[in-house]
Amino acid sequence: MCSPIYSNNPPENGYDSKLEKHFISLLSDATVSDINAKLTFVKHGIYLFIQYKEMGYVVNSFPEEVFWNMVNGLYRLIHDCSDKILELFLQVVKKDGFQAIKPFKQTDAHKVQQFEDAMEFIKDIENMRIVHFHNMKTDSITDKDKERKVEKKFQKILNNTIGPKSEAEWEHCITWIYKNCKNIQELLEERIKFLQTEATEEQRKLLCEKYYSCIRVYYNGIMFEIIKEILRKKRESYKDCTRILALVKENEEDIANKAIVLIQNADRRADPYLAALQAADIILTQKKQI
């Protein structure tokens, strides 16, 4: 095997064209940063992907290994609240009487399947990541339902009953990831362009309100780690789980509210994670709990 080539952008000095589909642009820091920076109709910006840091993998490795590294990277990209934000941006808007309270125009009939495929792909990645990585832990409880879903998905991708075995079959699965990631990028670009150039003020307002709701869900999931990080930065004990849980229980709503206010009042792009850290510092300091 030739010297390793790392993802997620093709090297400038060229590469084997057979590896074209091994480079997933959606997994690169540059692409994620670009997407996060494109919505400027509000000063604080809209982060579609939060806390993502690219983890390169060897592109010219064995196809099976490349595939699972892609799955792992995509799971990291969409975990926490990013899947909820993607669900917001990739929703199908139907003429069902509720389209007036949606942040996007009615979805064209010929585009509906693309959006549905994108959301299905996100669920597939979650299932594959859990089945392949989580179920390998000795203390994990095997999720039989997800296992069956993954088996059926592989069968559908390959049109067989045994799943991927050969290198060619794993390459076919990589192509499946590549095409779906390309589809998601195209749909996000379309929705971002609409919000920037065509959306009404009411649609933009609805988008922001739903975005804040997604952020609140995100904060509920990471509040323990937020407070733990503040204690670490203040050089206080951050290994006392009982204390941290007590601080979370007493302060999580106040911290989330403060973080949202900080985001809304920001005169520049505001990273929701950094806003939560700042809010936790302010609230805990005001209450003299740190």
Enumerate the predicted regions with their spans:
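Conserved short strand/loop->alpha-helix "switch" segment adjacent to the catalytic nucleotide/phosphoryl-transfer site
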Residues: D108-E116
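Amphipathic alpha-helical interface elements
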Residues: I5-T107, M119-E120, K179-Y218, I222, ...
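Alpha-helical rod/repeat scaffolding segments in eukaryotic adaptors/tethers
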Residues: G56, N60-P63, E147, E151, ...
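Charged/polar positions within long, soluble alpha-helices
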Residues: I130-I141, T175, K182, E186-K193
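Post-HExxH zinc-binding segment in Zn-dependent metallohydrolases
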Residues: N159-C173, I177
